[in-house]
Amino acid sequence: MIKLKRGMIIDVNLDPTLGSETGKIRPCVIVTNDVYNERVPVIQVVPVTAWSGKKGRITTNVEIHPSKSNGLSKKSIADCLQTRPIDHRQRLVRIRGKLSSAKMHEIDRALRIVFELNGIGP
């Protein structure tokens, strides 16, 4: 059995979608804690999409530069507003790599804004 960990970047099949949801097979960052990742098939992920100047100005988007450790091949954005649950047994395509602790702190901050946790809001 694959051990998925918080901060991993995995390719996920996000289809089918409805409305403005992010779709296709694309990289996603695992944001659930490792206790859940080990015990339940449904995990929470943040989709990763191609970087653009417009997307880069959105507070809840986190810029990610490609590296050997994260497995990305181009400058990207973690779109924390598009966070969604997936059943990894059905949707996982492959594991790419892992983000640094510093980058995960940026994603955590963006998620706190999205969900208004700890008094941080828009």
Question: Whereabouts are the PLM-identified features?
Answer:
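Conserved functional hotspots at enzyme active or ligand-binding sites that engage polyanionic ligands
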Residues: 1-122
